[in-house]
UniProtKB/Swiss-Prot annotation:
Residues 50-80, 90-119 form the 4Fe-4S ferredoxin-type domain. It is a peripheral membrane protein. Its cofactor is [4Fe-4S] cluster. It is an enzyme of class 7 (translocase). The keyword Protein biosynthesis does not apply. GO terms for cellular component: plasma membrane. GO terms for molecular function: 4 iron, 4 sulfur cluster binding; iron ion binding; NADH:ubiquinone reductase (non-electrogenic) activity; quinone binding. NDH-1 is composed of 13 different subunits. Subunits NuoA, H, J, K, L, M, N constitute the membrane sector of the complex. Keywords: 4Fe-4S, Cell inner membrane, Cell membrane, Iron, Iron-sulfur, Membrane, Metal-binding, NAD, Quinone, Repeat, Translocase, Ubiquinone. This is NADH-quinone oxidoreductase subunit I. It catalyses: a quinone + NADH + 5 H(+)(in) = a quinol + NAD(+) + 4 H(+)(out). Binds 2 [4Fe-4S] clusters per subunit.
């Protein structure tokens, strides 16, 4: 071992000690999580919830677009129909042990029924407890879009009623009558 190698080795040791010493008095970036609350950013994609429309009914119309858009296939549902012709999910299941929280289901939903909340604390001891059913996902409020009601906006026909006869729906305009 030469004198040059000793000086270089000693210099690197001194540089490392100085670096550790300079960082010892800086502000810590690590948060002590359970004691200090963590505030996620405003557009954080966390747990999935199902919302209700302003009338208190389920917004989900079981169109199955969310399940098709999901890249990992963690959403499953079965469509059923009420007496007045409206669709609803007979069951709606999300497997959070597979979910990657990408938000594709929220983007695909035409009724804004699926919304992602900033809730991220979903630790469980058994994987089966991470499979949420419709009752676990439904919240009492309308979520991010309080005034939106899919059936009023879409103008979908309801059993026994023609277009324009449903609640809060105008008669269709005869386009041919507008021609000169």
């Amino acid at each position: 071992m030469t004198l040059k190698e000793l000086v270089v080795g000693f210099g690197t040791q001194i540089r490392s000690i100085c670096m550790v010493g300079s960082n010892a008095f800086k502000k810590r970036e690590t948060r002590m999580y359970p004691e200090e609350p963590v505030n996620p950013p405003p557009r954080y994609r966390g747990r999935i919830v199902l919302t209700r429309d302003p009338d208190g009914e389920e917004r989900c119309v079981a169109c199955n677009l969310c399940a098709v858009a999901c890249p990992v296939g963690c959403i499953s549902l079965q469509k059923a129909e009420t007496k007045d012709g409206r669709w609803y999910p007979e069951f709606f299941r999300v497997n959070f042990s597979r979910c990657i929280f990408c938000g594709f289901c929220e983007e695909a939903c035409p009724t804004t029924a699926i919304q992602l909340t900033p809730d991220f604390e979903m630790g469980e001891y058994k994987r089966q407890d991470l499979v949420y059913e419709k009752e676990d996902l439904l919240i009492s409020g309308p979520g991010k879009y309080p005034e939106y009601n899919f059936y009023r906006m879409a103008g979908m026909a309801i059993d026994g009623k023609d277009k324009g006869e449903a609640e809060n729906e105008a008669k269709p305009i005869d386009v041919k009558g507008l021609l000169p």
